[in-house]
Amino acid sequence: MERAGDQAPGNPEPSSLATLGDPQVTLLTVHKRWSFKRSPGTGGSSRPVISEEECPPPSEEGEFSQKVLNGSEEISSKQILSKLFQPAMKQSFAFDNNGYEDDLDGVCPSQTAAGTISIVGMTCQSCVKSIEGRVSSLKGIVSIKVSLEQSSAEVRYVPSVVSLMQICHQIEDMGFQASVAEGKATSWASRVSPTSEAVVKLRVEGMTCQSCVSSIEGKIGKLQGVMRVRVSLSNQEAVITYQPYLIQPQDLRDHITDMGFEAVIKNKVAPVSLGPIDVRRLQSTLSVAPPAPVNQNDNNSETPGGQGVPLHLRVDGMHCKSCVLNIEDNIGQLPGVQSIHVSLESRTARVQYNPSLVSPGALRRAIEALPPGNFKVSFPNGAEGSGPDSRTPPAPSAPCTMMLAIAGMTCKSCVQSIEGLISQRVGVHQISVFLAEGTAVVLYDPSRTHPEELRAAVEDMGFEASILAENCSSNQVGNHSAGSAVGPEAAGAPVPMQGEAPQPGGLHTNHIPHQSPKSLLASTTVAPKKCFLQISGMTCASCVSNIERNLQKEPGILSVLVALMAGKAEVKYNPEAIQPLEIAKLVQDLGFEAAVMEDYTGSDGDLELMITGMTCASCVHNIESKLRRTEGITYASVALATSKAHVKFDPEIIGPRDIVKLIEEIGFRASLAQRIPNAHHLDHKVEIKQWKNSFLCSLVFGIPVMGLMIYMLIPSHEPQSSVLDHNVIPGLSILNLIFFILCTFVQFLGGWYFYVQAYKSLRHGMANMDVLIVLATSIAYVYSLVILVVAVAEKAERSPVTFFDTPPMLFVFIALGRWLEHVVKSKTSEALARLMSLQATEATVVTLGEDNVIIREEQVPMELVQRGDIIKVVPGGKFPVDGKVLEGNTMADESLITGEAMPVTKKPGSMVIAGSMNAHGSVLITATHVGNDTTLAQIVKLVEEAQMSKAPIQQLADRFSGYFVPFIIIISTVTLVVWIVIGFIDFGVVQKYFPAPSKGISQAEVVLRFAFQTSITVLCIACPCSLGLATPTAVMVGTGVAAQNGILIKGGKPLEMAHKIKTVMFDKTGTITHGVPKVSRVLLLVDLATLPLRKVLAVVGTAEASSEHPLGVAVTRYCKEELGTETLGCCMDFQAVPGCGISCKVSSVESILAQGERLQGPPTAHQNRVGSEPSETDAATQTFSVLIGNREWMRRNGLTVTSDVRDAMTDHETKGQTAILVAIDGVLCGMIAVADSVKQEAALAVHTLKSMGVDVVLITGDNRKTARAIATQVGINKVFAEVLPSHKVAKVQELQNQGKRVAMVGDGVNDSPALAQADVGIAIGTGTDVAIEAADVVLIRNDLLDVVASIHLSRRTVWRIRLNLVLALIYNLIGIPVAAGVFIPIGVVLQPWMGSAAMAASSVSVVLSSLQLKCYRKPDLARYEAQAHGHMKPLSASQVSVRVGMDDRRRDSPRASAWDQVSYVSQVSLSPLKSDKLSRHSGAADDRGDKWSLLLNDRDEEQGI
């Protein structure tokens, strides 16, 4: 390569930076360096100017250049770089970090440039005039035009005087937010100087919420060299302005990838050659591997002959001659490169280089670092630095051992690929990869390779690798000196094994035995340990991926498994390298809250097996000993009698199928023990059956008893004439005989379960209502039986009055209440059973061969699925476990988690959820969470915990009975004692009021009978029958009335709590909205005469008829309705691209149009509105090429979306609607807006609740923009958006902790935990079965006004329950003293039958009071509208407070203004505000692409249909 000639006199000499941009000039052509001084510049700031005061004389520079040309050993490549670039770089660093660009006046003639600046915050024409006046006064501004409607400014300026960034700063100083619009003109300096700004656009996939945007903007904005970051959630892209001499697009991409997202460089503005910093970077890479010693006597040569070492490289990715020149010019500049020749045809490069200055690896990295960044370099012999003519191999050194953790291996093919490729790398002696443990042990030469290079090589193969341990020990091999004559044995090196090639330089290495990596690691470090972290703040799958990917890159971390719903992370780590607290700190650095769970040991596997073939105790011992000796099994117990084995194991080490295989290997057969499905512990069928039988038995024998009792209460003038009073035998009347027979059956059959419950209660030292019931009935029965036996024994003339009528009445009413109680409990528990029914029963576990080819498929029960299994899921099947997609693409219905109807795109690496439905393609997934660790199991746990936290309605009565029962027993005992004392003191009192006893009975007996009678009367009349009926009867009547009004209320708990509700939380999709997408607008973008509306609808409807997407179904349904037909045209070549749109060819629509026109008749109002349309008379079939989708889909197909169309789409998207573009035959011809419309009564229901003093909150898994749009329509001020089911539960608990009673209104499976946790859960009748079962109240008619009606009815019912309780208490307060004989002195005394009658009367009074609820009438719609008339006002966006996920920071709209009523102003993310000045100035760029749809579940992206 020749040196460039001198420039002509008078022309300015190029700076070092400009020289590097000229492909015809090398590094050695620099004759003069420019230094920079500060001088007053535009707007009071300073800008650089050129001065030659500090330039060295030409002689000095010439001497320097001559030394380089001569290859003097005194001048190194680092000196070259520092000498050439230090002054320029030093100054450009200072200026660029302050946001200014280098001024090159005198180097390049002045010229003007045009640019566009986006401005946020303008509200009127006064703002426009202020900005125009301020900016036009700046030096270098030619003209400026500000548009209020477009929120932008068109500026023409002189780049050499002022930059767009300086203009932006001036506008921001006025109080507005300004940023350079994307895609506009850049300054001249940025096109020439590699040290100025460049822009790169990256496609970022995996963002699901605004927190993802904030996370990316915050982290990337803090990187050195990043000027501005703008992330679009809807477009799934990031536009980054950066300084290329500090950071490269590949670095930005890697940083975003490390955060858990998938980033791809779409396009960039890159320098055409290497800048000074790029060269410095390449120079720094030379220190990776130490160069061989340099012969100081040779000048830039390796051999006495002075010739360099030749190296042949294969270079892929070259496309034209410019690629060849790019490589030759830039690589030829590197120190140590003597010559380079690149061949485009053979895709090779021959380099003559000096190995003392540059290594083959550095050359490879230098070529691959050249723009555009798509060159791939490989060595023909597969080893770096082993060129064919290499004569000076490096000196050998002692080998080292390292252990890698490798994630992503799925089969033996992965193991062979890694071992085959890594073993060929230079310096690698041997490698052993272990699939089960996910590790690799490598023996390598540290003088020829580096652990980080090996780790990067594994990652280049598509796996994730991290370094666990390193060990470099000098005693592993002998010392080999160059002049030693001692053989390997004498030197201490082991003799190579048979078949093992000697290593270069006579180095021999130990063979790595194929054993567990844990044993290999034990020689260098301790065994890995496992810790568990509690993590909060995760909102979506990208948070999980973010944590897993970043932790796995940390040294010492073996594996990471994060569970989103459980909020836990399982980390396997090397305790020598890292500790749990450090891991928690790493998670905290990622922006999450993390704490080490000290006492948590993880969930061990539990397996119950049926074993056949056992004959004696020896078989049991053999099985148990075999299992207990197996690593990973913590417990094993085998029962010979039942042929069952109970095994506990660590799922990290061993799985259920492995245990089954172990048992079969020793000669027995094992299978999964049959278990009762749907969680038998939640089933109340046994209790329901027993209390039902108890009630029916008591009823059958109790009805005659009650009939006879009523008969005896009828007044009779001749009481002795009754047939029932006749004695069968002396002392035993017919009535008492019938009472005895009936009561005996009731006492011992119908009352059996009461005796069981009372016994259990007394055994635990408690006295509840069961004890009181049993005590009262038993004493009444025993007393009646005793006095009847005595009367018969004494042959009394009259049969005594007994209490045989008391037990049947008590048992009938109480058994009925218990039966109803357990029925309600069973209905509540059915929610859990239905949740469990979502779980698949079997999984298709596959075995993969090379290239992921399925070798074998096996149907495995869910209990036998192990972590790490590869599972195949076909279209329409359920995902059996949580996992990651290994192969295939599909759409998954995850509504059970998100509650949103839109399917989610799944591709390799995506997370899938157990219980969700696979909608389209067949996929292979890797199981990550199985058994109780799945997301579905966590939801079941949430619902179960919420339900268990609720006390049953009987708890209050039981608590009251805990005091009432002992009190009544004491009163009864005191009554007995007092009357005994009174009777013996004054027998006349007893004789006066006690029925005439038979002759021959002593006074003492009379006194004891009377005292005992009063005591029994107290127990009978004080029985809590009325208390037990007060609530259940009101509940039964109230729920019946509610059901008649379209409200299903489950039990007394919701009725009791609903009147206390102070906060109502509404879900969005399916609750506030209909949950079904509908077309809200069709906008034609072409002339009606060219393409009529009916033809557009016919074509679009035909195209969408082949789509299964919910939006496509909605569009098809609309087109059929508008065309008045059920048949559409013919669709061919249909192709659907998830996340973008569809393309197809449509024909045969002419007959549909002609038929529609014949059936249409007179023009409709819709036709009059759109204008007359020409009829279709062309009989020939026309074929249309159709594209339907989002902006990105149109861009991919070469169509331009104009600003007017973008504005129309943005207008709909800010309202929470999805805008779809339609192109026919390559022409953008229409836009269709699809929305999930708000229910008509939603706003009225919200207003009525507010007028009742109830706070209303909207909580949804949808994005915050859609949530805000819905909230403004219905009048809700507080919104929680982008929340998970666990977040909904947490929000309910948060409000409950503030002392508020919370009602949750929802319709989906994802709402069921919150419905169960809330004080009152209200489900929409059209919702899922799980939600309906988990809720306390169900709105059968799907009318939100019924939420108001349920609260209103609750208040009426609770008032009635309180009245019933007052009546019951009054009865007891009056009846107990009367029964005790307190009022005997005034002549008031109760006979035993009177006590029974009084008890019955109290029950009847309570029942009649409850029946009054049947007169309730629900307020009608007219009444609600009359109350709301003149008071309902719409909300603006600024009046709605939005919180995202578990974030308690408010996401309010901008300050209220007239602009709020017509436009939505994008929010400024908070994270970039923490970055440098430039990021703060540009963080408010208008993101028009935020296309959240009401129908999207967890993706802020327009869904293709």
Swiss-Prot record:
InterPro entries: ATPase_P-typ_cyto_dom_N (IPR023299), ATPase_P-typ_P_site (IPR018303), ATPase_P-typ_TM_dom_sf (IPR023298), ATPase_P-typ_transduc_dom_A_sf (IPR008250), HAD-like_sf (IPR036412), HAD_sf (IPR023214), Heavy-metal-associated_CS (IPR017969), HMA_Cu_ion-bd (IPR006122). Keywords: ATP-binding, Copper, Copper transport, Endosome, Golgi apparatus, Ion transport, Magnesium, Membrane, Metal-binding, Nucleotide-binding, Phosphoprotein, Repeat, Translocase, Transmembrane, Transmembrane helix, Transport. The short isoform is expressed primarily in the liver with lower levels present in the intestine, hypothalamus and ovary. The long isoform is expressed in the liver. The active site is at 1067 (4-aspartylphosphate intermediate). CDD domains: HMA, P-type_ATPase_Cu-like. Mg(2+) binds at residues 1307, 1311. Residues 113-179, 198-264, 309-375, 400-466, 529-595, 605-671 form the HMA domain. GO terms for cellular component: late endosome; trans-Golgi network membrane. Its EC number is 7.2.2.8. Residues 51-63 have a biased composition (Acidic residues). Cu(+) 5 binds at residues 540, 543. GO terms for biological process: copper ion homeostasis; copper ion transport. Cu(+) 4 binds at residues 411, 414. Each HMA domain can bind a copper ion, they are tightly packed and closely interact with each other. Wild-type ATP7B can usually be loaded with an average 5.5 copper atoms per molecule. This is Copper-transporting ATPase 2. It comes from Ovis aries (Sheep). The gene is ATP7B.
